[in-house]
A protein has these predicted regions:
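Transmembrane alpha-helical segments of polytopic membrane transport and secretion proteins
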Residues: 1-49, 132-139, 320-328
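A structural signal for multi-pass alpha-helical bundles of membrane permease subunits
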Residues: 44-328
Length: 328
């Protein structure tokens, strides 16, 4: 069989032969619209985001939805039978202890957040200046501060309970006796118990603030401070007009994060004072914990958890407004 000519169909001059067969050019079949849309979806960011979305829904959104459901029931911890009811919400709203607990939460949170921000900034500035001056011991200082952050909150409460102990072996009262001062009822006096809880929380949380602010301080150009020093600016003026404006975003982000952590913290207070004496150190998160695991009232505990969530979201939204925006 002879192969077809190079020009197909056969032509005579520039015109094709009248009876020559015509071969249609190959046509590529287009995929269906549904398959094309699916392929585009699979090649986009959705497959990469799907595991994170599943984990977010499983460990965050589902517990919130379940807490909302339990808040409208009379559920108890070891009782399988639950009925829809508004009794849990009514009992929480009419609780005589709730105003005291909200006041304790406000005092504890504000004092702890301000203390962690202030002390964390002071240590971060000290470390940065010591590094620029090439002083020894900066690594040891950072390690010492970070060691407090590594300790679990329960252990942190136990440590400070021993330090604040009013027994003869209490370290702080022993030091006060040595210098001629009278011992202080750190944990048994309601006016001192909250201060003790705040000190223990600040001691542990300062490292977190120090890390964030240390990174922000390292990003400030040293030439700005050098130029201000040449212009005879004082140390306070350099801090107020150069350092603080550059730390605004880091300070607000740090404040938001430690605000949320402090609002949800109860384990340090649980091991330090147990919420006492009386209700002097009982905060909202500890009240919710005691309601569920001591009173076994799951419905009331869910209401308190939702209340804590609302407070956290409201305060966070109020602080996010002050975050600096990029100018377009």
């Amino acid at each position: 069989m002879r192969p077809p000519p190079k020009s197909w169909p056969p032509t005579k001059g520039s015109e094709p032969l009248p009876n020559a067969p015509r071969i249609a050019p190959p046509v590529s079949a287009a995929p269906p619209a549904g398959k094309l849309h699916g392929a585009r979806a699979l090649s986009g960011p959705l497959p990469w985001l799907l595991p994170a979305l599943i984990m977010l829904g499983l460990f965050y959104l589902y517990p919130i939805a379940e807490a909302l459901r339990l808040a409208f029931t009379d559920a108890r911890l070891f009782d399988q039978t639950t009925e829809p009811s508004l009794d849990s919400i009514r009992r929480v709203s009419q609780s005589a202890a709730l105003p005291v607990i909200l006041q304790n939460t406000l005092v504890y949170t504000v004092a702890s957040v301000l203390g962690q921000l202030g002390l964390g900034m002071a240590i971060a500035i000290l470390v940065v200046r010591a590094e620029r001056a090439r002083l020894r011991g900066t690594m040891a200082l950072r390690t010492l501060v970070l060691a407090a952050w590594v300790i679990p909150a329960i252990a942190n409460g136990v440590i400070w309970q021993l330090l604040f102990s009013e027994a003869p072996f209490g370290a702080i009262n022993s030091a006060l006796r040595m210098v001629g001062f009278a011992p202080v009822a750190w944990l048994s006096d309601p006016s001192n118990a909250m201060l003790s809880a705040v000190i223990a929380t600040i001691w542990q949380g300062t490292a977190y603030s120090m890390i964030l602010l240390y990174a922000a301080l390292k990003s400030i150009d040293p030439a700005l401070n050098e130029a201000a020093a040449i212009d005879n600016a004082t140390g306070f003026e350099r801090f107020w007009f150069i350092t603080l404006p550059h730390l605004r975003a880091a300070l607000l982000v740090n404040a938001i994060l430690i605000l949320i952590m402090t609002l949800n913290m109860f384990d340090t207070i649980l091991s330090l004072t147990g919420g006492g004496p009386g209700r002097a150190t009982e905060v909202l998160s500890l009240f919710a914990y005691n309601t569920v695991f001591q009173s076994f009232e799951l419905g009331r505990g869910a209401v308190l958890s939702i209340l804590l969530l609302i407070i956290s979201l409201t305060l966070t939204a109020a602080m996010v407004v002050f975050l600096p925006r990029e100018r377009k």
